[in-house]
Amino acid sequence: MKFTANSRIIAKNAVWSGVEVGFGLIANLFTSIAIARIIGRDDLGKARLGSYQYIVWLTTITLSMGTFGLPATTRKYMAEYLNKGNPEVARATYLSTLKLQTYISLIAAAIGFAVIAWLGDPGYLTASVLLVAAIVPRLIASIPSQANNASEAVRRNAAPAVAGVAVTAIVTGVSLYFGWEFVGLSLAAFLGAALECALKLRTVEKWLGHVRRGVVAPELRKRMWTYSGQSIALVLLALIVWDRSDILILKAMNPDTRQITFFSFPFSLVERVLMIPTLFGGALGFTMMAQYGRGEARLKDMTVDGGRYALMISLPLLVGMACISRPLVVLMYSASYRMMIPTLTLIALLAIPKALVTAPTMLLQTTERQGFLIFWGCVCGVVDIGLDFLLVGRHGANGAAIANGTAQGLAALGIWIYAWRADRLDLKLLDCGRIVISGAIMAAGVIAITRMAPGYLGLVLAVLGGAALWLVSLRLTAALKREDVDRFLSIGNQLPAAARPHWRNLIAWLAPSVSAS
């Protein structure tokens, strides 16, 4: 069976991204549970965790702004020129953006230190300094990371990322054991970021260091500055619409500091789970930008297929998480976090549109049509802030979840409609409907299991039963098409040799009519 080159590349990158994301998801889940149980074991601890989460979020604002401007530009134009057979210009682009990003990171850290000295809480001084210091390696690492993505070789990022997460998790565990609390957590973040940065810089030097540095032409430089500026505008809007900016209003309007913890923990957990469908969207995006350098003919089909696969991956994960939110919170975080149950349910369900928006966003960014994204982001940002003011004061974390999720849904709907009308996309809604029906069948089964079997056994049975029901539902609804079978088999070719026959049998079972023909 023949596979297209794009399918093979996307499959390979998705597998390597899966390694990175899977390791990070497991490490984050266990460390967050440990932090919640040890530091947040009483109401005072939960309040202190809320204050620390607020500081963490403030540092991520700078980090987010820095990781979407120049890094996005690096990925876009390196991919374009690498696939035009001009690696010299790609190297010049990389070195120019790396130098500028280094300056930006040092300036951002200096400003952060000044703010700490002026307005910082003395009780969190050392922790705040370490969190701000971690901005430098994180910002710098985003450039080699996107350079590797531009080359469509995500494997080069996997090992550094896993090493960084491992160091962060180990130091976090040691810190909790010795009672270093927030200083230890911040130290873990800094050490993990520093190691990941150093390793990623080394990987790029290995494959690009021998290339002669070219020249960035004035016309290209102008395009880069325009694209970078639009990317920064997009990330500012993303902080409002897609990130947890609701924390600001939550802190200002709700006197219960615990609500920040009840919002931050579920949000972080869902964000980690969202990385699973996003890893496929990311792999698709890298190939879309490379495809733009090779020719634009395939971009429309790649966009629609990317959205459908994101739905196929995200629906069971997010709906399943919402269905098991009660036993998950009570058993993993302890009964004292019961107030977090409805928040986790809301955030998980309302995050589904966020999982679907990567493909059309990448289409508009690849073709340098970010103007609508900026306009629509402004509209949705106003909606988010307005709903926050209406809901957060009275409903706390649940109000923030509703406001954030509603804005995300509106943003995703608008972006898909714009891409559909502007590019005349065939959205394949009937195929998407089959996936939604499969999700409904799975949800009904998982809810029934959690009600019949309480405790840890019920949680395990719900997860296993949900996975089985999802696969059975996909078979019953004939959700997989011929091209899906080809692509999933291509993914299977990246698995260890011993696992490949089992993968092929699973795909054949999921789509019997396609396999038979």
PLM region spans:
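Transmembrane helical elements of multi-pass membrane transporters/channels
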Residues: 12-32, 164, 188-200, 204, ...
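N-terminal membrane topogenesis motif
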Residues: 1-30, 86-88, 95, 123-124, ...
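Hydrophobic transmembrane helix module of multi-pass membrane transport proteins
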Residues: 99-244
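Transmembrane alpha-helical segments of multi-pass transport proteins
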Residues: 26, 30, 178, 239, ...
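Helix-loop junctions and terminal segments of transmembrane helices
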Residues: 67-83, 150, 208-209, 266, ...
